[in-house]
Amino acid sequence: MKVGAMLATMLLMMCTASAFATVKIYDDRGGQIGEYLAKYRALRVSGEQVVIDGTCASACTMLLGTIPRNRICVTPRATLAFHAASPTPDGNEVSREGSQILWANYPPDVRKWISRHGGLRPRIIYLHGAELFAMYPVCH
């Protein structure tokens, strides 16, 4: 009987710990869109919180439309970097399909900000500071 109670307690502690788990993003330069979508869909289901505490660039930014907003917070060090998708490492070629996938994974206020700053192009645009804090809560 004691073993059963102990196992039940351990299981409860494990569930509680995972319910309050946090994923921190410090320096994520992005990568393959498909890999990031799969990672963020799994993260969405996990219920984990996301703290952006540094650079989140390119495919990393798709978390904004994949993870519920109430589970994302940013620190004063947070910087989001947006650009058009590129199938080549040098970034000189633009992938229209990849850029459409990025765009579809941004919430409306982020799309509006991107549009005001020239849209998704090969040149990187940065969202940070007061403009970012107006969209996402500052982590406490």
Q: How should each PLM-predicted stretch be described?
A:
Residues 78-81, 108-110:
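Short, surface-exposed, polar/charged, turn-prone segments marking secondary-structure boundaries
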Residues 1-7:
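Bacterial N-terminal signal peptides that target proteins for export
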Residues 24-25, 34, 38-51, 90-140:
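Charged, glycine-interspersed solvent-exposed loop segments at helix/strand-loop junctions
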Residues 3, 20, 127-128:
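N-terminal targeting/assembly segments of extracytoplasmic apparatus and virion spike/baseplate proteins
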Residues 22-78, 84-88:
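Cleft-lining beta-strand/loop regions that shape enzyme active-site pockets
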Residues 14-18:
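N-terminal signal peptide c-region/cleavage motif recognized by signal peptidases
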